[in-house]
């Protein structure tokens, strides 16, 4: 389904009866007029079109030209007939301003990473289980390889949750660290995916659970078989079966140990199907070194280290020593490899782990329903406190390692989905929270479906629901097999097209009867041709998106989603998806956002508005000042005296606009803007 997303957006445009001129406007030509006269745009469906030369925020056409200098997103607004008072487009301020941005993120480890649970992402073979080819077919949704195309999320890295063979759906208990689970595909499928990711500038990191294996791993099976055959009272001999020392066995049941048989117990802190590895055994470390080299030599860009506080039970020093060993091993193979670790503990503890050489640690203080991000979005934490927290944590981490790369995230596979955090929210707080994450320094992480506002709470399988490509109603429409399958969408747009045809006919009454008949005949022919083509394309999109939907974990509950599917959100200018897309575009366009340091602007910060600058120490990147209104009411600040007074980018949760009137900056409810140096 390589072209489904492109077809979807193209089809949506066709349904509106619109066609775009293929000419390019001069980049930046309309920016000044757009910013200065934004208040003149009508927010309604019949808004007046911007001046010729302003640009759309989407590439509505399939553009396979990837040659240097190609920029499919710079599509001018079609010229409108002066007599035609019906405008075909509604423009958001985000599209009009952010479309001018050039995504210039450097090739380093400060990225935006998209977490993918392959099992639930996209199915390519119809078995209901996501697979690597399903991900390959849908890379264009994550990153289409065309900067500023305006159709993809533009994520620069993918974190693959475990892909190794495993008896469980989540695959954190592997039976072979150097292969791909057959349900997901083959090593060749992985190589194909990795090659395409790299061609698009996407890094790929693998989830690596070094703490434990499956009880079905050959190492454990060999140890189990040996111990079960060992005569009563005899101690195991390492030369006879070294795999016994790969784990921790005992004839006594200590805390955290589970029975293997009537005589032996083994350590399994997570659950009985995950026996803990003895990471102090040199042979185990040799095995793990071989595993990491296998994947790094294959081209993998790094690893996500699972549960690093559990390497050694109640032994923080042992955990840190092992993290140092992993970092030294990985960076000895590839100095540019990226490591991010899960240390689900308090902030001061995981801050201290930056001394180990691991590049990043997930910033749990900001995540989840009770984290700083959600508390700020709810209004339980002031904007000022949020800004101060950013500066304070950066100072904390840099005091341990000045080269730290923070790993902020809002949600992940072990947490309830974020759309359920705000019971009365119809989108604004969900959007704001996403931006708070994506405007933090470091390598920001987004969990698949978060950009759609997916739901899922109660138990782990619910957090890992199928990617919401298309709703059940849309699936049913795809399976209907007739014209009604396109539903009200086509019906409504057909009526609109007929109404416009009638209006065009009346406008032509002053012409000769022959001309009128010719015009009517052409309108009718064009309408029928466009309608047939549109129906075919929309039905193909619906069917393909329906086919790639996954079943999800068997233990998952049935529950409804709160917001629209990818199918509906991609073409919705004000959707959560397009808000995230704009936030990532801003992050990519101003490298200092991820790589700079936060300094609170106390002259302009208050409980409603967070104002802080981002600058890097060596002045390599253009500095910016970020303003965030965390409240549900408009808020104004005076930027008199600021060197960063040019409006560069905006994030708005609705059609309300960021306004700059002289030195007064007004942010709408939950509005955000980026200010920079005047050119």
Give, region by region, the residue ranges found by the protein language model:
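Conserved alpha/beta catalytic core and glycan-binding cleft of carbohydrate-active enzymes
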Residues: 215-216, 221-222, 226-250, 327-328, ...
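Short, low-complexity, disordered segments immediately C-terminal to signal peptides
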Residues: 19-45
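C-terminal beta-strand-rich structural cap/linker in extracellular carbohydrate-active enzymes
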Residues: 660-679
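Beta-strand-rich binding/interaction modules
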Residues: 634-655
């Amino acid at each position: 389904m390589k072209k489904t997303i492109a077809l979807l957006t193209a089809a949506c445009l066709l349904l509106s009866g619109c066609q775009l001129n293929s000419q390019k406007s001069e980049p930046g030509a309309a920016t000044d007029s757009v910013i200065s006269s934004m208040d003149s745009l009508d927010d309604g469906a019949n808004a007046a079109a911007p001046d010729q030369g302003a640009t759309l925020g989407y590439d509505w056409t399939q553009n396979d030209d990837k040659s240097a200098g190609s920029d499919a997103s710079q599509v001018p607004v079609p010229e409108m007939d002066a007599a035609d008072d019906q405008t075909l487009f509604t423009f958001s301020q985000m599209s009009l301003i952010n479309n001018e941005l050039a995504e210039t993120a450097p090739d380093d480890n400060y990225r935006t990473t998209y977490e993918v649970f392959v099992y639930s992402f996209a199915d390519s073979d119809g078995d209901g289980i996501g697979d690597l080819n399903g991900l390959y077919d849908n890379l264009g949704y994550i990153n289409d390889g065309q900067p500023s195309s305006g159709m993809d999320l533009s994520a620069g890295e993918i974190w693959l949750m475990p892909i190794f063979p495993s008896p469980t759906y989540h695959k954190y208990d592997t039976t072979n660290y150097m292969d791909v689970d057959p349900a997901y595909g083959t090593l060749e499928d992985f190589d194909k995916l990795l090659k395409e990711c790299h061609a698009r500038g996407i890094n790929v990191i693998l989830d690596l659970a070094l703490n434990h294996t499956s009880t079905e791993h050959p190492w454990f099976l060999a140890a189990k078989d040996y111990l079960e055959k060992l005569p009563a009272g005899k101690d195991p001999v390492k030369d006879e079966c070294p795999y016994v020392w790969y784990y921790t066995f005992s004839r006594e049941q200590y805390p955290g140990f589970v029975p293997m048989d009537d005589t032996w117990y083994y350590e399994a802190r997570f659950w009985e199907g995950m026996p803990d590895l003895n990471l102090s055994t040199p042979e185990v470390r040799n095995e793990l070194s071989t595993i990491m080299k296998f994947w790094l030599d294959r081209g993998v860009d790094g690893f996500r280290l699972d549960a690093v506080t559990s390497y050694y039970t109640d032994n923080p020093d042992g955990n840190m020593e092992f993290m140092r060993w992993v970092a030294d091993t990985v960076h000895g193979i590839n100095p540019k490899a990226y490591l991010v670790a899960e240390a689900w503990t308090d902030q001061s503890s995981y801050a201290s782990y930056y001394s180990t050489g691991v590049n990043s640690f997930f910033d749990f203080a900001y995540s989840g329903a009770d984290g700083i991000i959600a508390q700020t979005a709810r209004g339980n934490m002031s904007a000022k406190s949020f800004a101060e927290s950013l500066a304070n944590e950066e100072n904390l981490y840099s005091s341990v390692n000045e080269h730290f790369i923070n790993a902020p995230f809002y949600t992940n596979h072990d947490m309830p989905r974020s759309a359920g955090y705000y019971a009365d929210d119809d989108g604004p707080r969900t959007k704001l929270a996403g931006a708070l994450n994506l405007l933090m320094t470091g390598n920001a992480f987004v969990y698949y479906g978060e950009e759609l506002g997916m739901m899922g709470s109660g138990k782990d399988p619910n957090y890992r629901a199928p990617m919401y490509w298309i709703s059940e109603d849309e699936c049913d429409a795809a399976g209907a097999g007739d014209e009604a399958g396109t539903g009200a969408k086509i019906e409504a747009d057909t009526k609109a097209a007929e109404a416009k045809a009638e209006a065009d006919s009346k406008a032509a009454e002053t012409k000769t009867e022959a001309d009128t008949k010719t015009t009517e005949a052409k309108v009718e022919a064009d309408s029928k041709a466009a309608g047939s083509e549109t129906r075919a394309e929309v039905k193909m999109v619906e069917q393909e998106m329906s086919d790639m939907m996954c079943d999800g974990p068997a233990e998952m509950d049935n529950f409804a989603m709160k917001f629209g599917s990818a199918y509906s959100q991609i073409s919705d200018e004000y959707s959560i998806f397009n808000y995230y897309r704009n936030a990532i575009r801003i992050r990519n366009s101003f490298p200092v956002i991820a790589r700079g340091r936060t300094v609170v602007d106390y002259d302009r910060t208050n409980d409603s508005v967070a104002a802080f600058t981002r600058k890097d120490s060596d002045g390599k990147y253009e500095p910016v000042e970020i303003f965030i209104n965390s409240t549900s009411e408009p808020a104004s600040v005076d930027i008199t005296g600021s060197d960063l007074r040019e409006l560069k980018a905006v994030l708005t949760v609705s059609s309300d606009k960021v306004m700059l009137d002289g030195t007064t900056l007004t942010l709408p409810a939950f509005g955000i803007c980026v200010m920079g140096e005047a050119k």
